[in-house]
């Protein structure tokens, strides 16, 4: 008896592909290190923050890290670009990133930049990591310091304190931290060896430090050369200008003295011919 045996082989092909996510918040909350995801949004940073770009949609923000640069892709993302990126989720010193293992970068033209979220320093945490924010009423304790690259600087606002980080590539390098109050924009980032805390703000150049007033004092008015009928007042401002003093024996004042220093940031006024008592 002849037996005819027919064997059927079924080949199954499994394709691994990234599933497009609904939003960046979904990626941040529901996916793990090593997962491949696709995120879409608007770029909020440029070379001032190095090769890293920050991407934000209506729900959250996230860092994109291409490695050394964006040379493998059609272009280098700039602020305002709308794009979609597919890659592996990684973490660098607490900062959640997509990359450097990127498999697709698609540009969609100009997007609509998100409005910076107004916060206080203490609100910089994981929920805002990767987002563009604004902190008003900022002052820097180290007034008179010139910014250097790869450095951090403390700041104060709303009775709270925070830290900014400035890379060598940032155009803030060489700028002076004055004693003037500013409203500051930047991206909330994180640098922590154990992954906890270490939140810092990343301003994207001088444009992100907005003076709170057109002119401000960088030193208080001081009195010197005190004599029976005269004394000297001196002070400094952030910009060059003419300095004057009004004085008198009543609320109406009535007498004006002009600084002898002229149109400069340093002002000196000599008040003479005064009456003792």
Model region roles, listed by residue range:
Residues 1-7:
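Bacterial N-terminal signal peptides that target proteins for export
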Residues 214-277:
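Short, surface-exposed linear motifs at loops/turns and structural transition points
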Residues 8, 60, 191, 240, ...:
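Residue-level marker of positions within ordered structural domains that often coincide
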Residues 15-16:
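N-terminal signal peptide c-region/cleavage motif recognized by signal peptidases
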Residues 7, 21-24, 249:
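Intrinsically disordered, low-complexity segments enriched in glycine/proline and serine/threonine
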């Amino acid at each position: 008896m002849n037996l005819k045996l027919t064997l059927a082989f079924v080949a199954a092909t499994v394709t691994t592909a990234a599933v497009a996510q609904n939003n960046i918040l979904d990626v941040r909350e529901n996916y793990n290190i090593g997962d491949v995801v696709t995120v879409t949004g608007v770029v909020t940073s440029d070379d001032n923050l190095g090769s890293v770009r920050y991407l934000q949609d209506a729900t959250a923000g996230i860092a994109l890290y291409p490695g050394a640069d964006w040379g493998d892709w059609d272009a280098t993302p700039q602020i305002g670009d709308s794009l979609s990126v597919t890659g592996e989720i990684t973490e660098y010193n607490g900062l959640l990133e997509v990359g450097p293992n990127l498999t697709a970068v698609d540009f969609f033209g100009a997007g609509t930049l998100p409005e910076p979220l107004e916060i206080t320093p203490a609100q910089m945490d994981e929920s805002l990591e990767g987002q563009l924010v604004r902190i008003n009423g900022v002052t820097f304790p180290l007034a008179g310091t010139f910014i250097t690259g790869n450095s951090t600087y403390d700041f104060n606002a709303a009775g709270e304190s925070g830290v900014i980080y400035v890379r060598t590539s940032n155009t803030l390098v060489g700028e002076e931290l004055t004693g003037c109050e500013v409203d500051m924009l930047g991206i909330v980032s994180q640098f922590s060896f154990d992954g906890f805390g270490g939140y810092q703000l990343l301003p994207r150049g001088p444009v992100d430090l907005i003076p709170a007033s057109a002119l401000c004092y960088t030193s208080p008015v001081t009195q010197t050369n005190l004599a029976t009928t005269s004394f000297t007042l001196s002070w400094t401002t952030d910009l060059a200008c003419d300095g004057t003093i009004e004085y008198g024996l009543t609320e109406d004042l009535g007498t004006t003295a002009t600084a002898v220093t002229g149109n400069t940031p340093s002002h000196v006024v000599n008040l003479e011919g005064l009456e003792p008592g």
